[in-house]
Amino acid sequence: MERAISPGLLVRALLLLLLLLGLAARTVAAGRARGLPAPTAEAAFGLGAAAAPTSATRVPAAGAVAAAEVTVEDAEALPAAAGEQEPRGPEPDDETELRPRGRSLVIISTLDGRIAALDPENHGKKQWDLDVGSGSLVSSSLSKPEVFGNKMIIPSLDGALFQWDQDRESMETVPFTVESLLESSYKFGDDVVLVGGKSLTTYGLSAYSGKVRYICSALGCRQWDSDEMEQEEDILLLQRTQKTVRAVGPRSGNEKWNFSVGHFELRYIPDMETRAGFIESTFKPNENTEESKIISDVEEQEAAIMDIVIKVSVADWKVMAFSKKGGHLEWEYQFCTPIASAWLLKDGKVIPISLFDDTSYTSNDDVLEDEEDIVEAARGATENSVYLGMYRGQLYLQSSVRISEKFPSSPKALESVTNENAIIPLPTIKWKPLIHSPSRTPVLVGSDEFDKCLSNDKFSHEEYSNGALSILQYPYDNGYYLPYYKRERNKRSTQITVRFLDNPHYNKNIRKKDPVLLLHWWKEIVATILFCIIATTFIVRRLFHPHPHRQRKESETQCQTENKYDSVSGEANDSSWNDIKNSGYISRYLTDFEPIQCLGRGGFGVVFEAKNKVDDCNYAIKRIRLPNRELAREKVMREVKALAKLEHPGIVRYFNAWLEAPPEKWQEKMDEIWLKDESTDWPLSSPSPMDAPSVKIRRMDPFATKEHIEIIAPSPQRSRSFSVGISCDQTSSSESQFSPLEFSGMDHEDISESVDAAYNLQDSCLTDCDVEDGTMDGNDEGHSFELCPSEASPYVRSRERTSSSIVFEDSGCDNASSKEEPKTNRLHIGNHCANKLTAFKPTSSKSSSEATLSISPPRPTTLSLDLTKNTTEKLQPSSPKVYLYIQMQLCRKENLKDWMNGRCTIEERERSVCLHIFLQIAEAVEFLHSKGLMHRDLKPSNIFFTMDDVVKVGDFGLVTAMDQDEEEQTVLTPMPAYARHTGQVGTKLYMSPEQIHGNSYSHKVDIFSLGLILFELLYPFSTQMERVRTLTDVRNLKFPPLFTQKYPCEYVMVQDMLSPSPMERPEAINIIENAVFEDLDFPGKTVLRQRSRSLSSSGTKHSRQSNNSHSPLPSN
């Protein structure tokens, strides 16, 4: 009794309870055993269709007319056919005799137009089955997409019409019925003419034999076996009402759409009544709702037969009998087509069986008593339920109460579609369907008897999915229940709300719906799985990997293409450009260089590639905004001067530097010109080599009226790299003018103090943090970046860089190198930054807040190219902005880490080659130490190669003086040593123990890093996990057995270099002179050794002089 209020109530069907006379003494097992009816012959009217055997399982009806081609045929036209065969009434079973009066029958009308009679006293055995030959009760083309687009009209069996809106997912009652259409004007709109009609046909049947006695229609009556008709025989009067509407074009006569609905009505005529003057049955559910109401507990004695209650499942096409005591299933009969109507013939009366009776019979009396009010409310709610079903591809509606009568009907409603001023409110049924089956996926049960009925489902879904927009999207759902609530109808006069109902107490002994194989839907299943996988992958990548292109291999990226920007135009641009020209300021950068492209930006500046107008060679120009504080600016300039003096074959160096102080807002307006084009993708953080766009100025004159800006984006056709050294472009610039290709290093005026704090570094202002990439040692989220990676190099691995530093390799203008590989030059921007702030005491809350922002990594937020971005707190600069321009050498980018990643086996790493590489690294480190400097951040990603395979040590962001006193170090590096570098696992992996623990350290930290680099050169790793684990063990002097056996001499040297005590580590000069390198034989060994000794000697003398006069990084 709780089924009306719980979600599982309607999964099987809404069943009507009628009490029939039955046999109380029979058990459930005996009832099931005897409840299987034998196939019977059936009378065929008109077409003489053969009888279709049915049983307790679903079997398709033979000779059933396809729903898509149903034509309503009145029975009166058949007698005039020549050679017509007399219709043959159904033959009773062998053991069946004519039933005397008083016996009960269950009469069932199905959608295929057949009438069947079941004997409830004989376990539901089919008494007779009759096909009157007039076709299906429902046929329509209104639901096809080509008729009304995304809307479809669904007819009801009683003549009402509903409209399904797929976009709104709602069911609306159409304010006209079939009869109103027929009564309206024949012309419907300008392009539609309505034709059709309503036909009534009456059939006289023998109540207990099912033989057709006569058929009457508008054309007359015809009788069969009138002589044999017994005067005392009971007669069943069946009246079929069929309504048909067709819409045709007035000019062509082509049919546009049609639909036809019909239903049967039944009346019982006892033997004492006359059959003359038959009047239409009084049992119409629309006219007398009292006889169509749900049978309550008071009326159960009328529908009970020996304590057996009859119920009909509309969704499962079943008629079932339950025992009143215990609610056990006594018998059931399965039809092969949907049930349209049902009647109980008992004691000379015809009782309509409501198809939406949801009363549940259970032995739990306590539940019924405790929830009596809820059950009564649910019974009243489901009394007005609507069932949306599908038969042979055609959607239809069934309801125990005509919902359309609750609302006004307008015969000319469709004519208002063309009238914009016409407003007709349409009642709406919210689309919250109640699936009739408790288990949507059927259990596969093998049975030959089910095959015929299963084919009906298959035909229905196949035809419907091809011809209409599917509402029933699941193949194992024959329909949905749409219960209509009176309470909500009173609150909302124009809305019908659908609610989910369930009944957990529904009898579980009822047999599940017949199974349907899933093999037919394998394509849909596979497509759904693939779509889910693709959608999930896409969502995960977008949510957790916002920049997947940055994870590509550097060898797969491109440097630039010739994808051009449109010329900057518009009144706003002209206004800004006029202001720039009228300022009268002339930039040295724009005077001496022709900007080619923007290579990227880092935490402290923007890097451009520019061509010198004098020598036609390409350089890397880096623009840095200097801090406003004098002390911080002084330290920046001192470090730049010191690094510019480093000249060694194994060390990259700077070329030139100058300062520019443009007028206020001048630099911002220049940058704004470049950011006008929305197609320029400037990331919030520093661009990676994979997505950094290249911008090229073709023609822009500060004093011209028009300017032309072109973009050079990444291109797969570009060569491997930028050239080592400064390449000589043999072709002179075709453009005589140049443009201010610059980006404001500080587009937010509120971070000036933050920059001051950030520039109070012991490390170089030109450097940023370069993090070792890898699975376990940092996920490339450092601060250095390397632009324009090699496309063809097999060693390059993906890396995400945000460096503000530039390390350039051999200088000079090598024409030969440029001619051989004119576009193989590569720029490396990857010098390490300290990420350390000066230990200063903020003088105000603002400066303290800004210092906090500067300390927080990553630092790219201190330099933003987004000129439209405003912060909530702005500070006006106390002095004009000053920019430092540094002219640096373009160099090839292929670091040692990429080289090792491309050689993952010992066989691929020859001992002599690895030692040769290491020796060159040691030579460069020895030169640094001889100059009184220490690198402090040696690792494979900071070691580079020239075009002729000469090793270069770069990324001098953490270079500092070896003799720097403790006081200055405190001033310049307030953070712990391990935090001063990057705080990332990648760099920390190569740091010495004293750096990690924050203790004081010396130049021996570079020796510790050299030991790890030598080990990694000789001992390859297959995975990053193995690399991290092994290097961690080696730091603790736990070497792999393979390394100690294969390289005994190198093992001893590495063990000394990795000593926990800095005093026990050898000097760089001792490493170079180690006996391990004596046996090496490679070209240029002698020259390299002599050059190294010469530079070291001169460097030592210079260092001594510097110590007497001033240090490379003098302190205040």
UniProtKB/Swiss-Prot annotation:
Insert loop as annotated region, ranges: 647-888
Reactions performed catalytically: L-seryl-[protein] + ATP = O-phospho-L-seryl-[protein] + ADP + H(+); L-threonyl-[protein] + ATP = O-phospho-L-threonyl-[protein] + ADP + H(+); L-tyrosyl-[protein] + ATP = O-phospho-L-tyrosyl-[protein] + ADP + H(+)
Any one Gene Ontology BP term: endoplasmic reticulum unfolded protein response
Residue(s) carrying Phosphoserine: 715, 1094
Active site per UniProt: 937 (proton acceptor)
Effect of residue 397 to N: Decreased tetramerization and activation, leading to decreased ability to phosphorylate EIF2S1/eIF-2-alpha
Entry-annotated residues carrying Phosphotyrosine: 619
Chief subcellular location: endoplasmic reticulum
Annotated effect of mutating residue 164 to A: Decreased tetramerization and activation, leading to decreased ability to phosphorylate EIF2S1/eIF-2-alpha
Expression by tissue: Ubiquitous. A high level expression is seen in secretory tissues.
Residue span(s) of domain Protein kinase: 593-1077
Up-regulation conditions: By endoplasmic reticulum stress.
Effect noted on mutating residue 994 to Q: In WRS; uncertain significance
Quaternary context: Forms dimers with HSPA5/BIP in resting cells. Homotetramerizes in response to endoplasmic reticulum (ER) stress, leading to its activation. Interacts with HSP90B1/GRP94. Interacts with DNAJC3; inhibiting EIF2AK3/PERK activity. Interacts with ATAD3A; ATAD3A and EIF2S1/eIF-2-alpha occupy a common binding site within the cytoplasmic loop of EIF2AK3/PERK, leading to prevent EIF2AK3/PERK association with its substrate EIF2S1/eIF-2-alpha. Interacts with MFN2. Interacts with TMEM33. Interacts with PDIA6. Interacts with LACC1.
Protein name per its UniProtKB record: Eukaryotic translation initiation factor 2-alpha kinase 3
Organism placement in taxonomy: Eukaryota, Metazoa, Chordata, Craniata, Vertebrata
